Amino acid sequence: MIVSLMYNRLERKIMGYRLSKIFTRNGDKGTTGLGDGSKTKKFSDRIVALGAIDELNSMIGLMLTENLTPKIKKILTVIQHHLFNLGGEISMPGHKIIQKNDVLELEEIITSYNKDLPPLKEFILPGGSRAAAFCHMARTICRRAEQTVFKLNSKDTINTFSLQYINRLSDLLFVLARVINKHKKVKDVFWKKNIR
């Protein structure tokens, strides 16, 4: 217990310093520090994955500036925190934060929303309302983030639940884009093979 308290105080002290000081010049030679104190190249698979997750989180932040229902805003806000946790896992090899329940929650949300949507007979193009287009943009960024995390997993084992989470998240974003269009009374844009 005492060791745990000491560690927490030390962690707060380190984080306070790291968050207060914006630049350190330590990365000027192409390396950067990870959460466990180790160094890695700025173009390493781990840093590429962190960047993709951060980009996804930023896109979801942009979505939150749109006029969305309180329920969807709450879902997206929780996702932002989970993505930050996922970034923490990537930054600290061997660290696990994302849990099975986080994955199950995404699955429940997907199932709940999807049952109220009309069945798809054609592929959907990104678009409709601006908020839905942003959601589709987040979905495509999520797919890329997923690729980077799975690539990292091929070399260094990543938390199984984190892999499941990032995979389910892109599915949720697809469903949410449709839900947002429905709420805004805007039709989804359907693919037309022979359009001229």
What is the predicted function of each stretch?
Residues 7-196:
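Phosphate/pyrophosphate-binding loop motifs in nucleotide- or prenyl diphosphate-using proteins
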